[in-house]
């Protein structure tokens, strides 16, 4: 019923509408054009309307009859029929007449007034369509004389209007307007409260986008403010092929329609608050919301020719709507394309996101998908915004999880990044919708490695600057690489001391050990490369001195990469080093450092499986004869030996180190 009052306010060109009510009274006020005789007939006619203009909201009028139910308990029938209760209407075109009413001044009826008269109308509506004047004697249903609009009611009305309206007279324009005054029936305040909270408030706040002049709407102390939407308006001309095909009920004017969407601020803390508010509000409006058409939609749709059921709450599943809705969808698509063509990127992203974030239509309105939503969804699938423009195939679009700055073309030159990065938590709803509706997938470092052209990737790694390379390796190591275990071995990830990058497969091979029935992993015999590790980090320079090419990075610092490498045993590495030792190329200090490193008891750097016997096999030290002899084959200087054995003692320059001392046999 509240919408009936607001509808009248909009139709008569009001700039404001106030509704005041409490337990006993309801007062609806607007400052639009005063009623004329034609308008009065519209209110009094039963289940029809004299309104014919396409711009008049109430032209289809089930109308004002809903208001009458407010006068009594339940549907108000007993009060309407037995007690002859009804709403009182006052319509004026001079402010002095409003003031006279508020002050309870005497009034008198005037007969045979012309339609262009500026006299006010004051009447009580009995049985929904019988006008009773103040203090007018008429026949009741028993054909007895009675006064249905008493002086007491007139004074009561003026007093209550003065109480509620006086605070607004100075600041607002009331030089013309209409007032409806009702003594409320039992329980009606509670129903009005419920209707306001559940339907009216949100519906009107969106409807104000389509009601050009009506901007100041207040219910009791609550000011209703227009929820601003980006509105786009269109029309279907009379006599056009589309108009003829739609065949709207009223053919006196073009079909006017509009759609709206939230102007999303993607950088805000809660960018989709406006979208979520739209989604829990009615989707379709005929100036006011069709209350049962809440489609979980982020698109607002208004049309003056939409076909709705008699209760004004639901779309008709009929030929009018099945021809009309596709035309509105085409208009939305046209606007999307226009935004793209004129490079209005912001508007495109907002509308694209609004379409994408539309939820599932309730089952009882599922037919709307076929005639409206499906076309919108199909269009955005082939017009996906990307960081480089737009993509016509959503399967090539990826939601970026990749943090490092590496060209996506290395994976696939058709791939492109979705407009927004997945690491922005506030945009999660749009990523979820893109995955579900567009088939777009998140794309991280593991996905990239899986798809990457190995040669292109190797070339990029080779040419990357230090900061970019470090970022790439850090990100790669931060993920489990189980799904790319084989491929990761073929990528030249690590730079070595000769300035080149090598892959695991370049350096290490596998060999089946039949004796132990196992696969051994060994450094290739034709390679001089060694992966650096925590166990070799302290002897990097010595290894390079004896001819090894070692990785600049410590492999142990890349645990998720290393775990995918089948590394040779410490014993194999020790053997490889031992075989390459040339004591002539090492200084005395370097030789000592190698022996002490292998002989350490520090478990973090000690070679597993390498004990005293292995170290004694190293040929790094001279005896007193100046010959290089294995450590295990020299005598300690701590013993007194015959002169002929002194030649087999270690040189005195080695003897002083206690660690080395323990390696000699007595």
What residue spans do the PLM features occupy?
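A generic beta-sheet turn/junction motif
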Residues: 21-23, 294
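Flexible ATP-lid and adjacent glycine-rich G1/G2 motifs of the Bergerat
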Residues: 31-98
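GHKL/Bergerat-fold ATPase module
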Residues: 76-666
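Conserved ATP-binding N-box helix of the HATPase_c
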Residues: 1-21, 63-70
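Short beta-strand-initiation
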Residues: 14, 62, 281-285
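Hydrophobic/aromatic residues in the conserved F-box-adjacent beta-strands of the Bergerat ATP-binding
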Residues: 26-28
């Amino acid at each position: 019923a509240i919408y009936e009052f607001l509808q009248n306010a909009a139709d008569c060109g009001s700039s404001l509408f106030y509704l005041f009510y409490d337990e006993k009274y309801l007062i609806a006020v607007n400052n639009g054009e005063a009623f004329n005789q034609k308008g009065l007939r519209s209110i009094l006619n039963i289940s029809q309307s004299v309104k014919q203009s396409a711009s008049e909201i109430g032209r289809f009028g089930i109308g004002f009859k809903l208001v009458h139910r407010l006068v009594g308990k339940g549907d108000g029938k007993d009060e309407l029929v037995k007690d002859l209760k009804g709403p009182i209407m006052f319509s004026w075109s001079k402010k002095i007449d409003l003031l006279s009413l508020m002050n309870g001044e005497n009034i008198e009826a005037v007969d045979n007034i012309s339609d262009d008269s500026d006299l006010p109308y004051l009447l009580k509506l009995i049985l929904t369509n019988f006008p009773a004047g103040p203090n007018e004697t008429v026949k009741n249903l028993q054909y007895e004389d009675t006064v249905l609009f008493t002086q007491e009611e007139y004074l009561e009305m003026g007093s209550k209007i003065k109480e509620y309206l006086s605070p607004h007279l100075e600041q607002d324009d009331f030089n013309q307007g209409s007032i409806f005054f009702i003594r409320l029936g039992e329980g009606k305040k509670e129903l009005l409260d419920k209707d306001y909270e559940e339907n009216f408030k949100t519906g009107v706040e969106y409807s104000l986008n389509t009601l050009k002049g009506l901007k100041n709407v207040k219910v009791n102390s609550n000011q209703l403010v227009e929820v601003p939407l980006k509105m786009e308006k269109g029309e279907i001309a009379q006599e056009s092929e589309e108009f003829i095909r739609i065949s709207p009920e009223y053919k006196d004017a073009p079909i006017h329609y509009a759609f709206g969407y939230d102007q999303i601020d993607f950088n805000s803390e809660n960018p989709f608050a406006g979208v979520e508010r739209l989604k829990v509000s009615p989707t379709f409006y005929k100036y006011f919301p069709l209350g049962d058409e809440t489609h979980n939609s982020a698109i607002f749709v208004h049309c003056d020719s939409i076909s709705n059921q008699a209760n004004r709450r639901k779309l008709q599943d009929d030929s009018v709507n099945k021809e009309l809705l596709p035309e509105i969808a085409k208009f939305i698509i046209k606007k999307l394309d226009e935004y793209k063509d004129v490079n209005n990127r912001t508007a495109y992203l907002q509308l694209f996101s609004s379409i994408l974030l539309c939820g599932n239509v309730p089952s009882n309105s599922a037919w709307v998908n076929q005639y409206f939503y499906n076309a919108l969804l199909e269009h955005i699938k082939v017009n996906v915004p990307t960081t480089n423009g737009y993509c016509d195939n959503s399967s090539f679009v990826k939601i970026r999880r990749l943090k490092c700055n590496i060209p996506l073309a290395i994976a696939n030159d058709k791939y492109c990044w979705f407009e927004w990065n997945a690491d922005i938590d506030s945009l999660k709803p749009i990523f979820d919708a893109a995955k579900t509706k567009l088939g777009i997938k998140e794309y991280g470092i593991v996905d990239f490695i899986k798809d990457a052209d190995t040669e292109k990737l190797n070339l990029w790694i080779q040419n990357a600057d230090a900061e970019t390379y470090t970022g790439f390796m850090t990100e790669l190591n931060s993920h489990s690489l189980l799904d790319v275990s084989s491929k990761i071995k073929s990528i030249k990830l690590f730079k070595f001391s000769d300035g080149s990058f090598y892959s695991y497969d370049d350096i290490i091979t596998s060999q089946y050990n039949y004796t132990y029935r196992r696969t051994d992993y060994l450094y290739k015999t034709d390679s001089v490369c060694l992966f650096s590790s925590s166990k070799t980090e302290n002897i990097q320079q010595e290894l390079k001195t004896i001819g090894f090419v070692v990785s600049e990075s410590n492999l142990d610092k890349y645990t998720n990469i290393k775990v995918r490498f089948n590394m040779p045993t410490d014993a194999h590495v020790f053997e490889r080093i031992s075989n390459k030792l040339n004591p002539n190329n090492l200084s005395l200090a370097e030789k000592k450092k190698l022996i002490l490193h292998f002989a350490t008891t520090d478990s973090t750097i000690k070679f597993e499986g390498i004990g005293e016997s292995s170290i004694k096999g190293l040929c790094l030290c001279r005896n007193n004869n100046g010959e290089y002899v294995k450590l295990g084959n020299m005598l300690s200087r701590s013993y007194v030996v015959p002169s002929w054995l002194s030649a087999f003692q270690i040189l005195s320059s080695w003897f002083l180190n206690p660690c080395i001392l323990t390696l000699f046999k007595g």
